[in-house]
UniProtKB/Swiss-Prot annotation:
Induction: By arginine.
InterPro entries: Peptidase_M20 (IPR002933), Peptidase_M20A (IPR050072), Uncharacterised_RocB (IPR012166)
GO molecular function, one term: hydrolase activity
Keywords associated with the record: Arginine metabolism
Iron among keywords: no
Name of this chain's protein: Protein RocB
GO biological process, one term: arginine metabolic process
Pfam families on file: Peptidase_M20
Species this chain originates from: Bacillus subtilis (strain 168)
Record's function text: Involved in arginine degradative pathway.
């Protein structure tokens, strides 16, 4: 879409037109469409008069070794004066797939046809009502988050045409692969550091427009999130004692152990962090299966299990300690049950007892590797060889395979559970009460929100953590070097598959703010964005915030960068 097509429009019309155009182009994660979408975004920006005059202010960055040739798109606007203060706008350009649209796949990216379809859709009154109102735009990516890109593109145009109102700089970036491995934002870290060094930029904050949604029925609040929740993927390799089903009472079934662990962890709200006023989620099971590939009458040898764990204020080490404790409880109860079942069995069958051990050992990966080293085994070599020999496996299965190979080398073939971390890992970050920079940022954003609320009638509420996964997690780091080292020691093959540049992120230390587009049903076929707020109010809120930030900050106020030990 060229500048000439939107130059005559008012600001809200520009955002709507850009959103519809962006939605119409498929950019499903893990497809070449992500590269096509990046090219389109670059084409839009380069058509703006400012960038026609400053073509070097728009550029792309290829994602290293990417099979889909994806890229980041950057655009830089230098405001009036010589300020180095800079606000970052960022958004992800990929979407989830369209399989959920079923027979409507052909119109998954057609906003008008979907609105027409849902206006006749009688199976969900809320969806039908929204479609009939004309205030909602439907389509894959409409809310997550093509409209978010459109808001940034419209604000780029606004500031490029009103440089006198911009007392600093704006740096825009559109990133691919947020819905999977976050390779876009991770690649951008080096570029952000390059710009920081070469242009002597002082990054004040990064504003993400990832979608916000009602937290309960009738919720009209617009939430502003001043930090990002993190994510861990704790994995459990469970090794049992295989037996024929005719001797089942003598075995230790890894599925039994797995079930005991899952029953204690899955959706257990009592294990969730307690952060006042925040939407905090408990662990949830994402994968649970044994190693059997076909039918036979043997019990399983091993089971693989992993969970999604959001982290808010906890560290990876604290989470590992908690999971070890829960797993040990599960194993002790399993041992007792198996022993009781066997005792009752031999009593009923009037059989002599065998001398069986019901012990189940529990290790963190760090503990298990140390045990193997003490027995003269080189675990690092085994892990490296396994990763190289299994590059066809997806990352999590490669990790499980490495643990299985380690178990084969272990002279102790008793039942055991080995806990480790696998990708993806997203750091958490938030504004700290003891940081002058963070408190100033909180104050400035609140001023901008209050001003916008006064002129629009909207109600804004601040939250500490964006409750879902977002690229903003990778822009600053709260963990100390010691805590990061503890995480890496429990992550098999980090030196081969670990992609997070911790030191470079620490150099940036950019606060992440989410001022999102507003909508419903993200990742569902009924996904839709609310036009009155997203197209009319949100661009103004971000403009106000940008100007307030650039006016309020001075170079004498510097970020308290973590030193790595604490």
């Amino acid at each position: 879409m060229q500048y000439t097509k939107i130059s005559h429009m008012n600001p809200a019309e520009r955002v709507e037109a850009l959103t519809a155009s962006l939605v119409s182009l498929s950019s499903v994660n893990g497809t070449v469409g992500e590269g096509t979408k990046a090219d389109f975004i670059k084409e839009v920006i380069t058509s703006y008069p400012y960038f026609q005059e400053n073509p070097s202010h728009v550029w792309e960055q290829a994602i290293p070794n990417d099979p889909y040739k994806r890229k980041n798109i950057f655009a830089f606007i230098k405001g009036h004066g010589e300020s180095r203060n800079t606000v970052i706008y960022h958004a992800h350009l990929d979407t989830v797939g369209i399989e959920d649209f079923g027979p409507l796949k052909d119109i998954a990216f057609d906003c008008e046809k979907l609105a027409e379809y849902f206006s006749r859709y009688e199976f969900d009154q809320d969806v039908q009502r929204d479609a009939k109102s004309g205030e909602w735009m439907f389509g894959r990516g409409s809310v997550d988050m093509q409209s978010g890109i459109a808001v940034h593109l419209a604000n780029l145009l606004h500031f490029s045409e009103n440089l006198e109102t911009l007392p600093g700089n704006v740096l825009f970036m559109a990133n691919p692969d947020e819905e999977s491995q976050h390779s876009g934002i991770l690649a951008s870290i080096s570029e952000l550091n390059r710009l920081k060094k070469e242009k002597q930029l002082h990054y004040l904050a990064a504003i993400n427009t990832d979608f916000i949604t009602p937290l309960y029925d009738g919720d009209q609040t617009r939430y502003i999130y001043t930090g990002a929740a993190g994510k861990l993927l704790p994995c459990f390799y469970i090794y049992g004692r295989e037996v024929h089903v005719g001797d089942t009472l003598a075995g230790i079934d890894p599925n039994f152990i797995s079930s005991e662990i899952t029953s204690r962890l899955h959706n257990n709200i009592h294990l969730a962090e307690k952060v006042e006023g925040e939407l905090v989620l408990p662990p949830s099971c994402l994968y649970q299966r044994d190693n059997k590939e076909s039918y036979n009458v043997q019990t399983a040898v091993s089971t693989s299990l992993y969970f999604n764990c959001f982290i808010y204020e906890r560290t990876a080490k604290e989470m590992m300690d908690l999971l070890i404790e829960v797993t040990e409880e599960a194993c002790r109860e399993t041992e007792q049950k198996l022993s009781d079942y066997y005792e009752e069995y031999v009593k009923r069958a009037n059989l002599p007892k065998k001398h069986l051990s019901w012990g189940i050992q529990v290790y963190s990966l760090e503990q298990y590797l140390e045990k193997l080293r003490n027995r003269g085994i080189d675990p690092e070599q085994c892990i490296e060889q396994t990763f190289k020999a299994n590059e066809h496996l997806e990352l999590r299965m490669r990790c499980f395979q490495a643990i299985e190979e380690l178990q084969k080398l272990d002279p102790d073939q008793g039942a055991k559970v080995i806990l480790f971390y696998a990708p993806p890992y997203l750091p958490h970050n938030y504004l700290k009460e003891d940081s002058a920079r963070d408190q100033l940022l909180q104050h400035v954003i609140k001023e901008a929100a209050d001003k916008t609320a006064e002129s629009t009638g909207e109600t804004f509420v601040f939250k500490k953590f964006f409750p879902y996964l977002a690229d903003g997690s990778f822009l600053s780091l709260h963990e100390t070097d010691g805590e990061i080292d503890s995480f890496i020691r429990n992550f098999p093959g980090w030196n081969m598959i670990g992609t997070i540049p911790f030191k470079d992120i620490r150099k940036l230390n950019i606060p992440s703010i989410n001022m999102g587009v507003y909508g419903k049903d993200g990742h569902k076929w009924t996904e839709r964005v609310y036009k009155p707020y997203t197209f009319h109010v949100l661009p103004l809120l971000i403009q106000q915030t940008t100007v307030h930030l650039l006016q309020s900050y001075r170079m004498t106020i510097t970020a308290k960068e973590p030193k790595g030990e604490g």
